[in-house]
Amino acid sequence: MAVKVGSARIDENGKAHGGQAGEQNSREVSTQNWYLQSKGWSVYRAKNPSVAENIAKCMERACKNDKIGYDQYQRHTLYKAAEPLGFDVSKVTKACETDCSALVRVCCAYAGITGLPESFRTGNMPSNLNKTGAFTELTGSKYQSQSTYLGRGDILVTKTNGHTVVVLSNGSKYEGTVAQSTPDALGDRILKYGGEGEDVTLMQELLLKLGYDLGSWVCAGDFGD
């Protein structure tokens, strides 16, 4: 069975802003099957399973509430509407708006992580999630390039400015909470074909800057397979 994800995607006109408040076509804030993002995914898993469950639960409720739509210019109106309700978005009854990262911020707040800044966006999401101490970053193609090992409540965010989603169902080989691995620094180990990790990603980034063509691997942190 396909792994499902939920997110705030785009307004009813296929634009980032300017539509009517609230859900207009059942696709502005909605679920879909997991997909491999062209910009690549970074993966964050809550260390506490109950936090992960509440992140997923909030996203599901947002996707089902037709009072919640998409608009980058009004991205904080959902947060303001949900805050007095304990961030239970199922109780929001006035039409409001959010965007992908603002909605993840609301989901984290519902799970008890309320210190994320209003400026929380895909570009700074990794550093902000890491600062909370509540998440483990899962690296390598095992987590970033397939859905098999993903779990309900995982947060996926593009490696450059773009999009973020929350995983709503477990992959077939979901392992539960995973300890944070210490990445190898470039030069600490010999990189070989078939290797993966953050040091591989750094090597690929440096090769790209030098003009090398990496083909299908790009900067996925995967040295072939």
Where do the language-model regions lie?
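Loop/turn positions that initiate beta-strands
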Residues: 150-154
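N-terminal capping segments
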Residues: 1-117, 160-163, 169-195
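Short, basic/aromatic beta-hairpin or loop at an interaction surface
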Residues: 111-137
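Short acidic, glycine/serine/threonine-rich helix-capping segments at coil-helix boundaries
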Residues: 116-123, 190-225
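Functionally important transmembrane alpha-helices
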Residues: 167-168, 218
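Short alpha-helix capping/helix-loop boundary micro-motifs
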Residues: 136-146
